[in-house]
A protein has these predicted regions:
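Phosphate-binding glycine-rich loops of NTP-binding sites
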Residues: 2-43, 204-216, 246, 252, ...
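Walker B catalytic acidic pair
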Residues: 229-230
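Phosphate-coordinating catalytic segments in nucleotide- and nucleic-acid-processing enzymes
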Residues: 25-216, 221-222, 295, 300-331
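C-terminal lobe/lid and adjacent interdomain/linker elements of RecA-like ASCE P-loop ATPase modules
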Residues: 242-331
């Protein structure tokens, strides 16, 4: 379970975009090719190069289970910097190719739509959830009756995607997801515990957004990776705390989860789970991002004690609650 925290524009999403770019561009054999950007909006070299250092190239290095990193070097493909060439330093291992494959790496951006009654059918078989998470409901509708990996069966009595999603959704919100497919569209409603079906815009936006996160977690196979930006969107603090409990269980089942968030409830939820011995220190990594005096990103790993305490204080990290409370109490 991984959490990226820190101020706006400090580099958190850049790391996620680097992972997605690597997923798009790493190949079995070393060599050179043009940039592929199926998962990101970065279409030319100028979009992503470091302007602070006036970079004429940049690299993404990625390794799996302690292997030597596979390095992708990106250079401009023309004098205008409008195109990009990618050169891969070495052959990629089957393990690395596996975890970066389109079936094993799923992504929910902060720009995911959420809340719509009518949802489209996905024409792209290689991008299960869509570039912006617009096809999460489509994935659910197509796979809802399929059994999940045994490790991802978190609730007894059901083994299907539909059963597990609705168990968690009911537990977190009191609703169940109902999807009807007619023609080229899916129609979404939420069912109360009394059996009444409601349109998404009648149940609160947070229900739709948490539904997408739950589906994405269950859609990721054991050994795969799910990246989600701001899973706490539109959620009450109690729901945020319950959500991190769920995501920790999915991570414990063997799914690599990467969260980008500004929520102190998720951060403190991780600390609580550590203190309750429900999350091992070896199974969690939290990084705080900041910009240094030169405008460059620095990422500091947050170290925890077995009691959920923070070993070394990092200025500015989730301290606003304490600042406000001190002001209220005039301390």
């Amino acid at each position: 379970l991984n959490l990226f925290a820190g101020p706006n524009s400090s580099g958190k999403s850049t790391v996620l975009q680097a992972l997605l770019t690597a997923s798009d561009n790493v190949t079995e054999k070393k060599g050179k090719h043009g940039l592929k950007n199926r998962r990101t909006e970065a279409s030319n070299f100028n979009d992503v190069r470091n302007f602070v250092t006036n970079a004429k190239s940049y690299e993404i290095g990625i390794s799996y289970n302690g292997e030597e990193p596979t390095v992708l070097c990106f250079t401009p493909g023309d004098d205008s910097y409008q195109t990009t060439l990618v050169e891969q330093s070495a052959d990629a291992s089957s393990d690395l190719l596996g975890i970066l494959g389109s079936d094993n790496l799923l992504y929910l951006p902060a720009t995911r739509p959420g809340g719509a009654y009518v949802q489209p059918i996905n024409p792209d078989s290689e991008n299960k959830l869509g570039r912006n998470g617009e096809f999460v409901i489509d994935y659910y509708a197509k796979h809802r009756l399929e059994p999940l990996d045994a490790a991802l069966i978190l609730a007894p009595g059901t083994q299907t995607l539909e059963g597990q999603v609705n168990h968690q959704l009911d537990k977190l919100t009191g609703y169940r997801l109902v999807v009807e497919t007619v023609g080229n569209n899916h129609y979404v409603k939420y069912e109360t515990r009394s059996g009444k079906q409601l349109f998404p815009y009648h149940v609160g936006t947070g229900v739709s957004f948490i539904t997408e996160v739950i589906i994405a977690c269950f859609a990721t196979p054991r050994g795969g990776m799910v990246i989600t930006e701001n899973p706490e969107i539109h959620l009450h603090p109690k729901a945020q705390a319950d959500l991190i409990d769920f995501m920790a269980k999915v991570a414990k089942a063997g799914v690599q989860i990467i969260i980008e968030s500004h929520s102190d409830h998720l951060f403190n939820g991780i600390r609580r789970l550590i203190s309750q011995e429900k999350l091992a220190l070896s199974d969690v990594s939290v990084y705080n991002f900041r910009q240094d005096g030169n405008g460059l990103t620095r990422a500091e790993r947050v170290e925890f004690t077995p009691q959920g305490g923070i070993r070394s204080y990092i200025p500015g990290m989730f301290e606003q609650f304490d600042i406000d409370l001190d002001a209220i109490l005039k301390l």
